[in-house]
Design a protein with these regions (language model features):
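Carbohydrate-active catalytic/glycan-binding domains of CAZyme proteins
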Residues: 16-338
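Generic cytosolic/nucleocytoplasmic N-terminal low-complexity/intrinsically disordered segments
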Residues: 1-2, 39
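Sec-dependent N-terminal signal peptides
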Residues: 3-13
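Basic side chains
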Residues: 2-3, 316
Length: 338
């Protein structure tokens, strides 16, 4: 009897540690990029709003108009702090609409917010806004990053250099480009062709420009062949994130129309990366988008789902849960319906 009780107690405690929790109830946020700055956890999410745009084609109903910054003093804190609006669409000279998933990097005490938005011609570009504080407010540069396109910037610091990763299919417009040049018409590769890749570029010293032409990131299967466009369970769709663990580089992303978070492992920021498996099975809602961060020697997955809005794809809520590796360094798959 004592044994059973001890087992139940232990399993309850361990379940409580693993279970995800929602981070914010009052407003809808999504696509959280989490970072530890000055010993605090900062979250840079998209700010979802209900919208008059009813047609979901190409993500038009993700019609966000501003960014907020959220923070936690520690991971267990019950109420996430909202620092309020830190950048508005109307204060970005070049942007017309759709402030999608952002990320932030710190360099020499300044904070750089990277964000996608559609310009006046309806093309997604990536902009930068700068602040002296992690919680903003941020001031946008007058123009987007020269040569930028598509969505979902994620900035990664490695050996003193900063790299920007980006790209997203369909609504994210990656099919409109080849070799960094716009096509006359968007063209999807056919199923047997190589899948479109996320992009990477070194950032300039001042963090405001690409210091090189964006390059393709190769994601390979177990035989060393690039993943094919028809491989919807494994190929890149959007929402790339990169982190290191035991000196290896983990590139994680959403598979979009199959709604999974998956990852691939490489040995430097440019790759190639070899596909490994699923991090998170589909959540409630069409999109899945995440970040992975080490906090106090433990690893966490920040993500979103649409359960609290009753499954409305464009009204998403932030979540966090512990992420675990097995003894070989593979990420243990988590259930998106938890
Ligand atoms: O939030 C708008 C878009 O939905 C993001 O940019 C994508 O990653 C997807 O989550």
């Amino acid at each position: 009897m004592k044994k059973i009780f001890t087992f139940l107690l232990f399993s309850q405690i361990s379940y409580a540690q693993e279970a995800p929790r929602y981070l914010f109830d009052d407003l809808y946020f999504a696509d959280p990029s989490a970072h530890v700055f000055n010993n605090k956890i900062y979250l840079y999410p998209s700010h979802d709003i209900d919208t008059e745009v009813k047609d979901p084609t190409n993500g038009g109903h993700y019609n966000m108009k501003d960014y907020h910054v959220l923070s936690l003093d520690h991971i267990g804190q019950k109420k996430t702090k909202d620092h309020g609006t830190v950048l508005k669409l109307e204060d970005i000279p070049w942007a017309e609409k759709q402030l999608w998933a952002p990320d932030v990097a710190e360099k020499n005490g300044k904070f750089y917010l990277y964000f996608p938005a559609k310009d006046k011609e309806g093309n997604f570009k990536i902009g930068v806004a700068v602040s002296n504080k992690p919680e903003g407010p941020f001031t946008a540069e007058k123009k987007p990053i020269k040569g930028s396109y598509s969505i979902d910037p994620a900035v990664f610091k490695d050996n003193g250099k900063y790299y920007i990763y980006f790209g997203g299919l369909k609504g994210g417009q990656l099919e409109k480009y080849r070799d960094n040049e716009p096509l006359a018409q968007a063209k999807e590769p056919n199923d047997q062709e190589n899948a479109l890749s996320p992009k990477i570029a070194l950032l300039s010293q001042n963090m405001l420009e690409f210091a090189e032409k964006p390059r393709d990131i190769q994601i390979l299967d177990e035989k060393g062949n690039p993943l094919k466009a028809g491989d919807h369970d494994r190929r890149f769709f959007e929402g790339v994130w990169i982190h290191t663990y035991n000196k290896k580089y983990y590139l994680s992303y959403s598979t979009g129309d199959t709604h999974k978070l998956v990852y691939a492992i490489g040995y430097n920021p440019y790759g190639p990366f070899t596909y490994q498996g699923e991090i998170l099975t589909p959540v409630t809602g069409w999109t899945t988008h995440h970040s992975i961060v080490e906090i106090d020697h433990k690893w966490y997955l920040f993500y979103h789902d649409s359960k609290p809005s009753g499954g409305k794809n464009h009204l998403r809520s932030l979540k966090v849960r512990k992420l675990e590796y097995d003894e070989k360094g593979f990420i243990k798959t988590m259930n998106g319906q938890d």
